[in-house]
């Protein structure tokens, strides 16, 4: 349809010819800094940040995914352009298309979308996660509810047991209030 074609063309422009406007970057940086500052007062965010640092140490997984106030304030347009050039590449793109389209149409659309992207065969592998020593951390906070995290990195995502273990973890405790563990603790 015409709307679908227009949407695809618009998406190609956004993906293939991004506009790294300094004014927008500055506005979004201020918004992110405010969100990070607010999160630093919230017990769940504090616990999550400390937990990730505890189990991953200096590995990139140990860094807060939202960044830090300092890291956000240091981002320049040149950093965005470099990141785009290195990582928005055809040979690493996963394009997901959902809707009223056949597989042949979806493949054609995906090829069209990715055809304007460069290829980069020099993407660094993610470092191996090193096991950390057993530790217990307690954080004093005036919250009315405790946040308890426990865990250890045990396998890579490409391990054949990863997905079954992920589902089991989700059912037992990883899904928050929908988990069996939470049900046992809160309801019984």
Region locations from a protein language model:
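Charge-rich, well-structured scaffold segments of protease-associated domains
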Residues: 1-121, 138, 188
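His/Glu-based metal-binding/catalytic segments typifying zinc-dependent metallopeptidases
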Residues: 122-178, 184
């Amino acid at each position: 349809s015409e709307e679908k074609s227009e949407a695809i063309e618009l998406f190609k422009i956004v993906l293939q010819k991004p506009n790294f406007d300094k004014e927008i970057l500055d506005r979004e940086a201020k918004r992110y800094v405010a969100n990070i500052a607010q999160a630093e007062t919230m017990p769940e965010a504090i616990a999550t940040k400390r937990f990730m640092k505890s189990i991953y140490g200096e590995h990139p997984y140990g860094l807060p995914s939202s960044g830090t106030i300092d890291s956000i304030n240091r981002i320049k347009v040149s950093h965005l352009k470099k990141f785009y050039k290195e990582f928005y590449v055809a040979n690493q793109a996963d394009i997901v298309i959902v809707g009223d389209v056949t597989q042949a149409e979806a493949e054609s659309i995906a090829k069209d979308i990715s055809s304007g992207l460069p290829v980069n065969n020099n993407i660094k592998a993610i470092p191996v996660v090193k096991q950390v020593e057993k530790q217990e951390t307690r954080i004093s906070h005036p919250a009315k509810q405790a946040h308890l995290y426990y865990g250890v990195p045990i396998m890579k995502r490409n391990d054949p047991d990863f997905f079954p273990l992920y589902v089991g973890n989700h059912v037992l405790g990883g899904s928050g209030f929908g988990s069996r563990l939470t049900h046992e603790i809160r309801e019984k």
